[in-house]
Curated annotation (Swiss-Prot):
Natural source organism: Pseudoalteromonas atlantica (strain T6c / ATCC BAA-1087)
Binding positions for DNA per the UniProt entry: 90, 109, 151
Cofactor(s) for this UniProt protein: Zn(2+)
Taxon lineage: Bacteria, Pseudomonadati, Pseudomonadota, Gammaproteobacteria, Alteromonadales
SMART domains tied to this protein: Fapy_DNA_glyco, H2TH
Function: Involved in base excision repair of DNA damaged by oxidation or by mutagenic agents. Acts as a DNA glycosylase that recognizes and removes damaged bases. Has a preference for oxidized purines, such as 7,8-dihydro-8-oxoguanine (8-oxoG). Has AP (apurinic/apyrimidinic) lyase activity and introduces nicks in the DNA strand. Cleaves the DNA backbone by beta-delta elimination to generate a single-strand break at the site of the removed base with both 3'- and 5'-phosphates.
Catalytic residues, chain numbering: 2 (schiff-base intermediate with dna), 3 (proton donor), 57 (proton donor), 260 (proton donor)
Chain coiled-coil ranges: none
Name the record gives this protein: Formamidopyrimidine-DNA glycosylase
Name of the coding gene: mutM
Classification via Pfam families: Fapy_DNA_glyco, H2TH, zf-FPG_IleRS
Length: 270
């Protein structure tokens, strides 16, 4: 599943091709994605793309009329192609520009989304409820500490809660907790303030490094130019069950927390 770094890498990849260009046509081949694609997305036709933004794992293609909102879901990909490029299986949506460039949305599992937000309308509820962005000053370890004081849930589940902070998905939660030396099973309220202050900084570093490396390619994710992400080469615990810990050489363990595979070193994480 594409997580925040992968979505940010996609944004960085498509932005230079879209910003300043006019949308000629939006082609919807399959309306039934996670939610039905609204007919109102066609209101963007004829308008210039002013910006391409990201909020959590949502991408906003801004025009004077409103914003096309894209979510990659479990397996979504965005490709920049010539508008004459033949479609392949699972190519559901084309955003065709007047210069012949096309942003093509492919989603094999159809858990992605294409929504519309008209200029002046309030934010869609699920977006308005999101917590702060992890790479901004609105998020830090103090926030984690303050919000965790009554939380009995495992700390890994806590930092993956989008109301606490957006974008700390399963891969990066595992990696951040390993670097911080925190057992992912530990109750959130039992983690010390000192540990949370360090964890806040580590989350920022891990996500920034993943973006710099082009995201993590495990199965479905590729960059907008079709190239893979390389952060998978730097994973220290995720997906390494049974292998030796890079620090102490103990065996990496795996359990399920919140229906997610969780990887950790019992010796290094307390």
């Amino acid at each position: 599943m594409p997580e925040l770094p992968e979505v940010e890498v996609s944004r960085l990849g498509i932005s230079p091709h879209l910003i300043g260009q006019h949308i000629e046509q939006i082609i919807v081949r399959h309306k039934q994605l996670r939610w039905w694609v609204p007919d109102d997305v066609h209101l963007a036709e004829g308008h210039k793309v002013n910006d391409v933004r990201r909020r959590a794992k949502y991408l906003f293609i801004d025009t004077d009329a409103g914003s096309i909102i894209l979510h990659l879901g479990m397996s979504g990909k965005l490709r920049i192609v010539n508008s004459e490029t033949p479609v392949i299986k699972h190519d559901h949506i084309d955003i065709v520009l007047t210069n012949g460039v096309c942003l093509r949305f492919n989603d094999a599992r159809r858990f992605g989304a294409c929504l519309w937000q008209r200029v002046g309308d309030p934010e869609i509820g699920m977006i308005a409820a999101l917590g702060p962005e992890p790479l901004t000053s609105d998020f830090d370890g103090q926030r984690l500490y303050d919000l965790s004081r009554t939380k009995n849930v495992p700390v890994k589940n806590f930092i993956m809660d989008n109301k606490v902070v957006v974008g700390v998905g399963n891969i990066y939660a595992n990696e951040s907790l390993f670097i911080a030396g925190i057992d992912p099973r530990k109750a959130a309220k039992k983690v010390s303030k000192k540990s949370y202050l360090a964890l806040g900084d580590i989350i920022k570093q891990v996500l920034a490094k993943a973006i710099e490396q082009g995201g993590t390619t495990l199965k479905d994710f590729t960059q907008a130019d079709g190239n893979p992400g390389y952060f998978a080469q730097h994973l220290r615990v995720y997906g390494r069950k049974g292998q030796a810990c890079e620090v102490c050489e103990s065996e990496i363990q795996s359990v399920t927390l919140g229906q997610r595979n969780t990887f950790f070193c019992e010796q290094c994480q307390k």
